[in-house]
A protein has these predicted regions:
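Regulatory N- and C-terminal appendages and interdomain linkers associated
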Residues: 1-43
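A sequence-composition feature that detects small, non-aromatic residues
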Residues: 2, 21, 32, 46, ...
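Generic detector of well-ordered alpha-helical segments enriched in charged/polar residues
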Residues: 23-27, 31, 35, 43, ...
């Protein structure tokens, strides 16, 4: 039986990948937008993004996406937009198999534990390969950037040093800046 990529519950006979309500929650539309790419054309797309100097920082490969609205009878389509997209897509990697599925499952487990998480889901490339997608919470619906700080900024580190730290350093930052450090 087919399962919803957002909530993992069974789909009705005519639904594909998402319940209408689940699609509305993550994408804002009753029908999920089409992701018109395949893993094979990702390298070309990545080169274009790098040439435009609009890459997203981090360890894992990712692309910034936005939705081009479809007509009344057509679903929307995701397009790669550099830094200003409202979604982040993380595809499969050759080095670590099933990383998108693991990240989505981890987020679901966090939700079950009553930890607030960003809106997230799995989604399929045109060829059926699963990717992880998350809606950015640092952007308005119009795409304007919202100010947010991360541990790199709080620790006054350069972006290049973002992943050179320890849990102890993070704990000290939480103690320093939090009004409820034992809860944070």
């Amino acid at each position: 039986m087919a399962k919803c990529l957002y909530c993992y519950k069974e789909l009705n006979g005519n639904e594909r990948d998402f319940h209408k309500a689940c699609s509305k929650k993550i994408f804002g539309t009753l029908e999920a937008p089409i992701l018109p790419y395949t893993h094979n054309n990702l390298n070309d797309l990545a080169r274009q993004v790098i040439r435009s100097q609009t890459t997203l920082t981090g360890v894992q490969a990712k692309l910034s996406l936005d939705i081009n609205k479809g007509s009344k009878n057509e679903p929307g389509r995701f397009t790669i937009v550099g830094l200003w997209g409202r979604y982040i897509l993380k595809p499969q990697t050759e080095r670590f198999g099933n990383l998108p599925e693991l990240e989505d499952l981890t987020m679901h487990l966090a939700e079950i534990a009553k930890i607030r998480v960003v809106p997230h889901s799995l989604i399929r490339f045109e060829d059926g390969e699963l990717c992880y997608i998350t809606r950015r919470i640092d952007r308005t619906n119009e795409g304007r950037k919202l100010a947010m700080e991360d541990m790199c900024q709080l620790s006054e580190k350069l972006t290049e040093q973002k992943y050179k730290g320890s849990y102890e350093q993070i704990a000290k930052l939480v103690l320093r800046y939090s009004s409820a450090p034992k809860l944070d």
